[in-house]
Each structure stands twice: as C-alpha cells, then as structure tokens.
Amino acid sequence: MAITKEDVLEFISNLSVLELSELVKEFEEKFGVSAAPVMVAGAAGGAAVEAAEEKTEFNIVLVDAGDKKINVIKVVRALTGLGLKEAKDAVEGTPSVLKEGVSKDEAEAAKKELEEAGAKVELK
C-alpha cells in the first residue's frame, strides 16, 4: 500500500516541535534548500504604499518657538502638564519632543494650538 499525502501530513502533525525542527534541518541538508521565508516584491501603486504607511501614533516636535515664547510656553504647559521651568526649557531647547505616541487627532489639535501661539511644529 502506497503512502498518501494525507498520511504524511498526519504524521507531521503528530510530531513535537523539536522533532519537526530536526525534520526541517534534514530536508534542508538532503535537498539543498533553505526554510527562509520568500521575499515578496513591493506594490507598484503609490496609493497602496501610502495606505500601508498610515501612522497611528505621532510624536509632537517643537521645532522653533518663534517670537512669542511666552504664549508658546503657556500652550506647552497646558498640553504637557509640565511646570513653568520645564516648559520654558523645552521651548528654549528646540527642537524638543513635547509628547510621544499620541493619536493623529490629538497631535493635529496640539499642532494647531502651538502654531496659533507662534511656534513651528512637526509631527513625526
């Protein structure tokens, strides 16, 4: 009686992880192949790449405080909860990361507030 594919699959499914690892190594040696995953070519369409790179978390980076540092310090304190000295140091030590890992909506709202106060902000 011949061994079928189903018999082979049933045998393999009953192996332990260690036994399966040894079996894979023997396949690699016997047939001169590698069990490394195959690299898939990237998508050609720009829209598909943009959708794949859509970020969900952003860092709010203060690039420049502008001329109205006092207003920017007030907004930084309100957004971050920092004390006066810490907020002043963050504003004067640009570029500085004000918040990390925030949602897109929160990041855009903070950027708008800071820009209205006279600062230059980047979302990364």
From Swiss-Prot:
Recorded GO MF terms: mRNA binding; structural constituent of ribosome
One BP annotation, GO: translation
Keyword Transmembrane: no
Alphabetic keyword roster: Ribonucleoprotein, Ribosomal protein
Domain of life: Bacteria
CC per GO annotation: cytosolic large ribosomal subunit
Gene3D superfamilies: 3.30.1390.10, Single helix bin
Pfam families recorded: Ribosomal_L12, Ribosomal_L12_N
Stored InterPro entries: Ribosomal_bL12, Ribosomal_bL12_C, Ribosomal_bL12_C/ClpS-like, Ribosomal_bL12_oligo, Ribosomal_bL12_oligo_N_sf
Role, per record: Forms part of the ribosomal stalk which helps the ribosome interact with GTP-bound translation factors. Is thus essential for accurate translation.
Family, per entry: Belongs to the bacterial ribosomal protein bL12 family.
Subunit structure comment from the entry: Homodimer. Part of the ribosomal stalk of the 50S ribosomal subunit. Forms a multimeric L10(L12)X complex, where L10 forms an elongated spine to which 2 to 4 L12 dimers bind in a sequential fashion. Binds GTP-bound translation factors.
Protein known as: Large ribosomal subunit protein bL12
